[in-house]
């Protein structure tokens, strides 16, 4: 099966968001604006409480989904429907903003390490005004597939070729979301089909993809093909993200992602008038 080539490698961009939370943006930057259906990917990894205590106070979303994956630490989520919960170490929350939600994401700790990711996934026009909803799972509910050489694959969304299925369905874009750990010298291979866009987010160690060596905190955007192949130069951890492109216009400003300019303007108007 054809191995996917590398289209582009982009080093993550240090920035801050919310109330001063320090993070590295790996998708959603001038160098990598989006990769249909994925809009943005942030990695946050802070040992100093001052770099995360401000959290993400109340803010709106419409027209897409947010996926929060915690590696270390605890994050409390509250929204304007009265829903509340905590995402703990290894846990996942896949939230559909749909027609609109106002929520906060605040650290449930005042010391220790806070580490994880937030991914934004676009929705097709037919689902942008759907009802908000959640899929939430603790780490014990997320399967880990063991492979030769000590390679492990934590399957959050979708399923591996051998049938290990994550607790979250792929949704409208048939998304795959795998967290792969590779000991030095090992290889990870996975067919993802040639109808998905696929990217890698290297967040620990150093890997080789095709003919390129990739350092930590880099995004690797892959070309057409069937199989994703990663070689570990050192012990490494990598997210594999793949999804079917939506192929529709994207009008995106701040927390709203719509398919028309009129829809984007309406989102701002609805929020300002308290219609969320």
Curated annotation (Swiss-Prot):
Domain of life where this protein originates:
Bacteria
Membrane spanning residue stretches: none
Database matches in Pfam families: Pirin, Pirin_C
Fetch the SUPFAM superfamilies from UniProt: RmlC-like cupins (SSF51182)
UniProt xrefs under InterPro entries: Pirin, Pirin_C_dom, Pirin_N_dom, RmlC-like_jellyroll, RmlC_Cupin_sf
Please report which protein family the annotation says this sequence is part of. Belongs to the pirin family.
Q: What is this protein called?
A: Pirin-like protein CC_0481
Q: From what organism does this protein derive?
A: Caulobacter vibrioides (strain ATCC 19089 / CIP 103742 / CB 15)
Name the lineage.
Bacteria, Pseudomonadati, Pseudomonadota, Alphaproteobacteria, Caulobacterales
